C-alpha cells in the first residue's frame, strides 16, 4: 500500500490545488510532444507509472529479489583484498561500498546507470528551447535506471517547485548568519534545520514498519532537493547582493529556478549552463567524501536532512570541494604573467617553471580516471558554442592542448589529462557569477541529487548500519608477524 503524506503545513489549499492541476496538465499534454522532441528515446524509456514514487514501488520488490538471489549464490565470493598501504592511504581502491547510481570507468569516465555523459546528453529530456539535459531527468535515471519521458520530468519539476518553500524559521536562520560565515557553513546549517519537518524522523518516532522506510525517506529526499534551491539563493543574495530572493516559479524547471533565485535567469545561456552543471556534478560513485558521508550517516537511520548536511560538511573540505577555485586562481595568476601570449613556447615555459618548483598543474589528473574527464569535455563543448572568443577560455583551451604532453614528459603523473574542475570556474566567471567562495554551494546543490537517490535505495534495500573493522598500528604489526 502506498503512503500518501499530507501536504507541507506551509502550503495553502489553493496553492496545492493549483500545483496538482499543473502537474496533471503537464502529464497529459506532454506525452506526444516528448517523443517528437526526443526521437532518440528507445525502449529504455520509463513507460509504466508516471509518478516517480509509484515507479519505485514497482521496482523495489524486483531489486530486492534480484539482490537476495545474487547474495544467496555469491555471498561468500571474494572480490578483492586490502593492503596495509590502502589502510593508511584513505582506503583508496578498496572494494567495499554499494552505490547504484553511477560507476566510474578509468577510461570512459562516469556512467550514470550505465549511460555515459554523451549518451545522457542525447537521451535525457531537455527544455523545449535548450540542448542540455534537465537535472530532473538525471535524477529519475539515477533512481530508476530508466530514461524518463518529458512529461514525467515536467511533473517532477512541478513537484519540486511545490515543495520548495522554506519554513520561516529557516529563512530567519540564514538571514541572521554573519556575512563572515562561509556559505557552505550556512548551507549545512540550513539543511540541518530542515530536520524539524522530517517525515522520516517523525514516522520513526511514532513507530513504522521497516518496509515503509523508503516511502518516508523518499518524501524527505524530495523536500531536500527542492529546498536546496531557495536555501542557496538566499545565501547568495544575502552575502553578495541586496538580500532580495526571487520567488520560485511553479511552471519552471529546477535549473531555471536555481538561476532565478541567484539573479541570473534573464540569461538563457546561464540557465543552460546550470542544467549542464547540475547534471554532470550530481554523482560520481559512492567512495568520494560527500557521497560516502551521506551514505554512512544515513546508515544510522539519520534523516536525509542530517545525512546531507554531513555530506555538505565533507564537501566543504578543501581537498574535495575547492578544486575548481584553485584552478581558477591558477589561471588568473598565469594570465597576469603571460598576458595574451598563448604560444606553445610561452605556455610550456610557464608550466615547466611551475613543475620544477615542486608544484602541480591544478585541474589535471584524477584518482581513478586515466583519460580526459568527460565532464570536462561537456563543459568544453558548451564553451566552444557559447564563448569561443573569451580570453580565459582560450587559455583553458591552449592548456588542454599543451599540458598533457608536458606532464607526460615530466613523468610523475598517471593521468596527464584535465578533470572536471579544470573548466567550471571559467564558465561561471564569464556569466558574472564571480564569487569563488560560493562555488562549492553550487556543487552541493548538484551533489544532493546523487546522494538523495542512493539514500532512497539504502532504505528500500534495508542496508544495515556501516561498521567496518579498524586496527591499531600495533595490531597490524602483530598480524604481519604471525604470517
Curated annotation (Swiss-Prot):
Boundaries of the annotated transit peptide in chain numbering: 1-16
GO BP term, pick one: citrate metabolic process
EC id: 2.3.3.16
InterPro entries, per the entry: Citrate_synth-like_lrg_a-sub, Citrate_synth-like_sm_a-sub, Citrate_synthase, Citrate_synthase_AS, Citrate_synthase_euk, Citrate_synthase_sf
UniProt pathway annotation: Carbohydrate metabolism; tricarboxylic acid cycle; isocitrate from oxaloacetate: step 1/2
CDD domains in alphabetical order: ScCit1-2_like
SUPFAM superfamilies found in the cross-reference section: Citrate synthase
Family classification: Belongs to the citrate synthase family.
Name of the protein in question: Probable citrate synthase, mitochondrial
Protein encoded by which gene: cit1
Amino acid at each position: 500500500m502506498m503512503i500518501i503524506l499530507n501536504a507541507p503545513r506551509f502550503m495553502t489549499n489553493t496553492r496545492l490545488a493549483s500545483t496538482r492541476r499543473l502537474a496533471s496538465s503537464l502529464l497529459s499534454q506532454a506525452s506526444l510532444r516528448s517523443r517528437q522532441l526526443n526521437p532518440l528515446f528507445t525502449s529504455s524509456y520509463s513507460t509504466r507509472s508516471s509518478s516517480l514514487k509509484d515507479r519505485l514501488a514497482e521496482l523495489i520488490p524486483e531489486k530486492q529479489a534480484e539482490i537476495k538471489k545474487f547474495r544467496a549464490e555469491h555471498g561468500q565470493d571474494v572480490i578483492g583484498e586490502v593492503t596495509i598501504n590502502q589502510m593508511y592511504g584513505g582506503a583508496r581502491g578498496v572494494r567495499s561500498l554499494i552505490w547504484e547510481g553511477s560507476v566510474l570507468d578509468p577510461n570512459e569516465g562516469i556512467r550514470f546507470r550505465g549511460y555515459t555523459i554523451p549518451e545522457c546528453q542525447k537521451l535525457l529530456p531537455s527544455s523545449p528551447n535548450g540542448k542540455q539535459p534537465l537535472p530532473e531527468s538525471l535524477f529519475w535515471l539515477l533512481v530508476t535506471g530508466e530514461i524518463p519521458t518529458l512529461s514525467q520530468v515536467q511533473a517532477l519539476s512541478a513537484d519540486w517547485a511545490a515543495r520548495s518553500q522554506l519554513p520561516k524559521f529557516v529563512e530567519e536562520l540564514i538571514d541572521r548568519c554573519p556575512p563572515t560565515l562561509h556559505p557552505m557553513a550556512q548551507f549545512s546549517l540550513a539543511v540541518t534545520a530542515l530536520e524539524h519537518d522530517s517525515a522520516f524522523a517523525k514516522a520513526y518516532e511514532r513507530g513504522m514498519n521497516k518496509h515503509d522506510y523508503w516511502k518516508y525517506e523518499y518524501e524527505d529526499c524530495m523536500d531536500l532537493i527542492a529546498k536546496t534551491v531557495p536555501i542557496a539563493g538566499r545565501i547568495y543574495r544575502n552575502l553578495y547582493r541586496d538580500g532580495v530572493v526571487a520567488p520560485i516559479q511553479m511552471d519552471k524547471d529546477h535549473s531555471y529556478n536555481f538561476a532565478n533565485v541567484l539573479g541570473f535567469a534573464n540569461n538563457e545561456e546561464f540557465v543552460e549552463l546550470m542544467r549542464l552543471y547540475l547534471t554532470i556534478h550530481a554523482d560520481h560513485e559512492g567512495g568520494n567524501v560527500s557521497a560516502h558521508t551521506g551514505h554512512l550517516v544515513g546508515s544510522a537511520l539519520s534523516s536525509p536532512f542530517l545525512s546531507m548536511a554531513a555530506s555538505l560538511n565533507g564537501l566543504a573540505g578543501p581537498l574535495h570541494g575547492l578544486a575548481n577555485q584553485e584552478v581558477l586562481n591558477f589561471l588568473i595568476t598565469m594570465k597576469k604573467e603571460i598576458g595574451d601570449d598563448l604560444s606553445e613556447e610561452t605556455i610550456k615555459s610557464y608550466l615547466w617553471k611551475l613543475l620544477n618548483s615542486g608544484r602541480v598543474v591544478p585541474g589535471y589528473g584524477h584518482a581513478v580516471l586515466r583519460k580526459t574527464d568527460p565532464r570536462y569535455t561537456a563543459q568544453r563543448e558548451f564553451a566552444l558554442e557559447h564563448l569561443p572568443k573569451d580570453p580565459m577560455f582560450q587559455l583553458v583551451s591552449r592548456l588542454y592542448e599543451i599540458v598533457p604532453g608536458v606532464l607526460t614528459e615530466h613523468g610523475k603523473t598517471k593521468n596527464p589529462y584535465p578533470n572536471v574542475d579544470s573548466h567550471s570556474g571559467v564558465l561561471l566567471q564569464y556569466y558574472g557569477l564571480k564569487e569563488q567562495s560560493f562555488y562549492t554551494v553550487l556543487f552541493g546543490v548538484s551533489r544532493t541529487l546523487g546522494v538523495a537517490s542512493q539514500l532512497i535505495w539504502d532504505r528500500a534495500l534495508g542496508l544495515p548500519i556501516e561498521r567496518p573493522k579498524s586496527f591499531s598500528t600495533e595490531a597490524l604489526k602483530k598480524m604481519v608477524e604471525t604470517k
